[in-house]
Amino acid sequence: MTTNQQNAVVSQPQTVVVKLGTSVLTGGTLALNRAHMVELARQCAELKKQGHSVVMVSSGAIAAGREHLGYPALPNEMASKQLLAAVGQSRLIQTWESLFGIYGIKIGQMLLTRADLDDRERFLNARDTINALVANDIIPIVNENDAVATNEIKVGDNDNLSALVGILCGADKLLLLTDQKGLFTADPRKDPNAELIKEVKTIDDTLRKIAGGSGTTLGTGGMATKLQAADIARRAGIEVIIAAGSAPNVIFDSLSSEPQGTRFLPCEEALENRKRWILAGPAASGDIIIDDGAVNAVVGKGSSLLAKGVIKVSGDFARGEVARVTNSHGKLVARGISAYSSEDLAKIAGKHSKDIISILGHDYGSEVIHRDDLVVIQE
């Protein structure tokens, strides 16, 4: 590492979440690339030596399981993936333990599912565990618990999981390492004129269209999921970097003034803790479709959502559960905790607040979603 690199790195201690995808850990093969993994461990160790904290979100359990079992021919279904994850997770963590041991660093394993993030108390318990590991100079290595997770309780990919982990531990930076150099103006594998986007201040529909499709055969995340993760994290005040995992010193350079890859600047006004949980934790149980006037009030003015602005309700959710708020064209504009069940809300949609008690026979307040329980997604 050069003197210029060392001088460029911020001196104030920071917490960095490093997400390693399957393609990074395998180098595009079907097996874990231990030579590359030890280099990644070395870079994390270098960060810790400089006084920073590191939290790792590591894919690779399924790849490790497939390698250990001799690449069996299994049907491409959840039961097969759970089998491979059950076999491979222990192999993966053993590999990380031995590699970090070279640098005298202890690790701790955390396996999470969506259910751990949906429930506020379990969310806080997970946060406390990660913070305790970090405080005791241990690197948490997090993965989704694929061996038991079903579609209903899966986060779905480790890109989004890493954003949620970043919120859990109050990270300063989230580094999403992939097999690409960053986000390009077009798919660089198909378009030779594609250019790397160095910095992003706002994530809009144009960027989402550029991000496009899915990931590799062994992995579950493509550039689109990385953009989703970046959007979640930056709203919580976390700077996000998408970069190539194979690039020299890419982890250490994430703290420099000119990091490799694509840098996503955090939102100027970071969400408070409760709203971070609403954004990161609960899976939405249904949709509340609102009219243009309500969109303007919620997004433009930061107002609470009233029944008058609700067009209709989709899905089934109870009072106190999180729902998606969309405009009349189905575009997501917010997430929030509904004061009314979907059944009740369907009855009072489009009605004045003063009429709620006469319609339902009870009243939980004039707001369908109070602004303190509402997180605006649209920018």
Swiss-Prot record:
The PUA domain, residue ranges: 285-363
One GO biological process term: L-proline biosynthetic process
Any one Pfam family match given in the protein's UniProt record, by short name: PUA
Gene Ontology MF terms: ATP binding; glutamate 5-kinase activity; RNA binding
Positions of ATP binding: 19, 178-179, 220-226
Function of the molecule: Catalyzes the transfer of a phosphate group to glutamate to form L-glutamate 5-phosphate.
Family of the protein in this entry: Belongs to the glutamate 5-kinase family.
Protein name: Glutamate 5-kinase
Source species of the chain: Vibrio campbellii (strain ATCC BAA-1116)
